[in-house]
Amino acid sequence: MRNSIVYFCLLVCCITVRAEELKLWYSHPAEEWVEALPLGNSRLGAMIYGNPFEEEIQLNEETVWGGSPYRNDNPEAYGVLSEVRKLIFAGREITAEKLWKEHAFTKQNGMPYQTVGSLKLHFPGHEKYTDYYRDLNIENAVATVSYKVGDVTYTRTLFTSLADNALIIHLEADRPHSIAFEASYSTPFEESAVIASKNRLTLSAKASAHEEVPAAIRLESQARIKTSGGKVESDNGKLIVTEADVVTIYVSAATNFVNYQDVSANESKRVDVILNQVGKKSYRQLLDSHIGKYQQQFGRVKLDLGHSLASQKETPVRLKEFREGKDPALVTLMFQFGRYLLISSSQPGGQPANLQGIWNQHLLAPWDGKYTININTAVS
């Protein structure tokens, strides 16, 4: 009998470990950008901080770049090529280098990939909370945040749909009329505006100029709120939700980018088309179609390097203890996380993953977030 009990306990532990393996999970909110949870569908990127009181969802759209279509080659280069060769063969390398720099290069070094900004959700009264948990399930590309305020449990479920081209934010509470928050946009772009009307919040902006190349990319992001119970009001660039039972927020973004030499599209119409279609579906339909499409790609590869009880610990602890102990499942998790990031940042019909995949909080990212072919191609 004792052996049976031991076997049952070990079996339960193994089941728990397997269930947690392909999740990154944390017992605290993200304090900085690199700790936020990345969601993406190639076109849209989102970083989820998971703060109960002041949720920030930093947004990216794959075609938000500084500058505008331009030529980065110097037409004078060919004319000096012969002279540069002669100087090199004559042993005058310094002179050759100076001549080449003067006539082969331009003032531009490539345009920067830029952020859209952030959608912020302010929850009054949620400063003090308990039982906090957040995770990113890379088997279904869904992030979850849960916590308690008093005796009410709040849950946020977020995913960037591969099937429907939108970020879905689903808010629930286990007590009726308990959801109340303010939604607002922020952006670092100087030329920008935010309008709140009924259940819709709209951010419009123009990307920035760079290295004497004028700005041409226009962008728009919309957040539309649907509630069960309660009400939605607009006030001074914000949407205010009170006494709701369940809330779903549909978010998307688009630009006027058509291709590398054409920026003539209508970004507002693009966003409207996406969100009008999304609004026709239930939350469950959106979730199921997203998971189904994601798993068509993610499910192609399985990897099992073994299991250990370390899999039950939260991700930061596992990373810290990895050198000192055995956690083969963490290697599996990191391998699959790499696949998750590439699936989420590069899909057929979209732009290739850039130097930061699709996630970037800056107007001037490290190395501009550009396509550095010697690195991007090899690593991705």
Residue ranges and their predicted role:
Residues 1-20:
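Bacterial Sec-dependent N-terminal signal peptides
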Residues 20-379:
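Aromatic-residue-lined binding/catalytic grooves and analogous aromatic/hydrophobic interfacial grooves
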